[in-house]
Amino acid sequence: MTESKRILADVLLRPVITEKATALMEQRKYVFEVMPTATKPLIRAAVEEMFGVRVTAVNTLKLPRKQRRVGRSVGYRSRPKRAIVTLAEGDSITLFPDT
């Protein structure tokens, strides 16, 4: 595996499987949790390389940080970044293979 493909493989952390994300799949939109430093062109290249599909749009969002307590001290969890990837007409990604 070349260095550029290894970098692209590290961009996508995991697919997001929620009720809302599952409903978006019917509109050819897939939600992934990505590295906080990932840019839209990098996310587009990673999805196209890993899944062999054409991406028409990438929307990103950062979730709000959540407060966590340990004893008396208060800390915060980091803000995860998500990407909503829209695929071209006729393309799809199989997240749940039939077994």
Swiss-Prot record:
InterPro entries attached to this UniProt entry: Nucleotide-bd_a/b_plait_sf, Ribosomal_uL23-like, Ribosomal_uL23/eL15/eS24_sf, Ribosomal_uL23_CS
Record's signal peptide: none
Keyword Phosphoprotein: no
GO molecular function: rRNA binding; structural constituent of ribosome
Entry keyword set: Ribonucleoprotein, Ribosomal protein, RNA-binding, rRNA-binding
GO terms for cellular component: ribonucleoprotein complex; ribosome
Gene3D superfamilies given in the database record: 3.30.70.330
SUPFAM superfamilies: Ribosomal proteins S24e, L23 and L15e
Origin: domain of life: Bacteria
One Gene Ontology biological process: translation
Family: Belongs to the universal ribosomal protein uL23 family.
Complexes and interactors: Part of the 50S ribosomal subunit. Contacts protein L29, and trigger factor when it is bound to the ribosome.
Function comment: One of the early assembly proteins it binds 23S rRNA. One of the proteins that surrounds the polypeptide exit tunnel on the outside of the ribosome. Forms the main docking site for trigger factor binding to the ribosome.
Stated name of the protein: Large ribosomal subunit protein uL23
Protein species of origin: Synechococcus sp. (strain JA-3-3Ab)
Gene (UniProt): rplW
